[in-house]
Each structure stands twice: as structure tokens, then as C-alpha cells.
Amino acid sequence: MEFATTSSRFSKEEEEEEEGEQEMEQEQDEEEEEAEASPREIPFMTSAAAAATASSSSPTSVSPSATASAAASTSASGSPFRSSDGAGASGSGGGGGGEDVEVIEKEHMFDKVVTPSDVGKLNRLVIPKQHAEKYFPLDSAANEKGLLLSFEDRTGKLWRFRYSYWNSSQSYVMTKGWSRFVKEKRLDAGDTVSFCRGAAEATRDRLFIDWKRRADVRDPHRFQRLPLPMTSPYGPWGGGAGASSCRPRRPPRSTSITAFARASTSATSTPLCRRGSSSSSAPQGRGFISTRPCHRRRRHLRLLTNSTLRCTTRAP
């Protein structure tokens, strides 16, 4: 079962790569066509927008009133997918905006945190399905080639992306123009891309795009390293600077060993008591000297040892 799941995932990735290559080839062909002298009409553009584009590209002079009326009719009858803005936007995803940036009240639509594949070699941005079907619906006619969506960034620059549906991965993607947007804005995995539109009825057909960097939690200057507490070279009974003042000072090791050796020597050098023949461990015979001290001698040894330890403890 795991092998089947892995193989299906790899097959989907291969299909996405093939579709990405096909999209890149289509982009190159379209760029060559756009480089020609004759202007080409975008399929989903309205008639007023096409007339405005044709009039702006014609060599003959056109009166300002006719141009203004064409622009007004375009904004009045424009669809939510903004196809042309008349500001010289390039069809491959970038163009110089006007010098005066108009302040427009925006309505936030959704955010997308880009993944490594979104900024990788596939040259596509996957749009979540719920947001794609809500804000960028596709009909059967536009599903074959997709739509060209125009967005404005924070500087007023226009960006045009091809928006389509991939049947292999069953996902909505933006392909054409996205790679240039990634390169210019230097997007990386974890960055957030925001999509907005005009809040007023007159600007509802205008789309906006914005981005923000991810918060780097591995910033070395964010958390400072705390100093470690200093340790004393002496032990708790060594009498050094780190020793506790409430505990008694331990005498030198040589003094205690000497006192214990003296106590042991005095205990072993005392005469041993005689034991009778009733001892089971000693051999039978009169006058046998036992190797064990009697209870009096044992008590004397304990007293001597305790007094020796007290003397050594009181010593400075």
C-alpha cells in the first residue's frame, strides 16, 4: 500500500513538471507573438477594453475625451478579473506603474504561505481550492487556456499571471509571470503572499498583491546566551571559597589517618584475655590464649576510638 501511494505521488509530480514545461513553452510562444507589431486581443477582455487598447496602440492621434469615455466604460462594465489597466503592463508579468500611486481602500481576500515547490523550478503558485473557487471562478470556456489576471503591488506596479486549472493534480495554479514575481521580490519558502481587491463598488474589479517575509526564529541576536555560574575548585568540605560556612571544617586527611592508625595499634597491642576450654572454636587445652578480645576490652576499644575522633574533630 505504501509503495502504491509513493508511486502515485511521484507520478503526480512528474505530471506537474510536464505541465509546467508546457506552460513555459506556451509563454515563450506568446512572448514571440506579442513582440510582433500587430496587437492581439485577449479573449476575456471586454469590447470597451479592446477598443481602448486598439486606440492607444494606433499611430493616429485620438482626442482625450474619447479616451476618457472608453476608460470610463471599461471600469463600469469590467469583470472581477482585471485584464488591462492601460498603464503599459507587460504581458509576461511586469510593467512600470504610474508615478502617482492612488490610495484605494482594499478588501482582504486570502493569504498564501508559499512552499518550496511554489518558489521552485515548477514556476507556479498553487491557490487553495476554497479561495480559488470563491474569488477566481473558472467556466468551461476559460478552463482550457485559463485567464490572465492583473494585480497591483504596493508600489503600483502591475503584474499579470495566467490562472488555470490542472487536471493532473486537480489544483488551481498561477503560472505565467509568477517566476518573475518570485525573482524580483526574492520570495523564499515560508513567506506570505496576500491577495486583495477594491472594497468600493467602483474599484471592485481591481486586484492587489502584497507579500511579507517570514519571521526568522533562528536569529542569533534574538536570544542572548546567559553566563554560566562559576564553580568552586574546592569541594563542599574542602574549606575553600565555595565551602559552606555553616558546616564544620574537616581536618586534614593525614591527621585522621594517623589517629586511626594509632588507635588500631593500641587496640591490637593490648594483652588478650584468657578463655576457658568451653570455646567451640578454640582447641582444647589449659592456658590457651584467645585471639578475640573480651567484652571489656571491646568496650575499651570503642571508648578509645570515640575519644580519638572527638579530639581530631576539635583540632583546628
From Swiss-Prot:
Residues 13-36 have a biased composition (Acidic residues). Its main location: nucleus. It comes from the Eukaryota. One of its GO terms (cellular component) is nucleus. Residues 88-98 have a biased composition (Gly residues). Residues 110-215 bind DNA. Keywords: DNA-binding, Nucleus, Transcription, Transcription regulation. Residues 1-100, 239-290 are annotated as: Disordered. InterPro entries: B3_DNA-bd (IPR003340), DNA-bd_pseudobarrel_sf (IPR015300), LEC2-like (IPR044800). Residues 46-77, 253-270 have a biased composition (Low complexity). One of its GO terms (molecular function) is DNA binding. It is found in: Nucleus. PANTHER family: B3 DOMAIN-CONTAINING TRANSCRIPTION FACTOR ABI3, B3 DOMAIN-CONTAINING TRANSCRIPTION FACTOR NGA2. This is B3 domain-containing protein Os04g0581400.
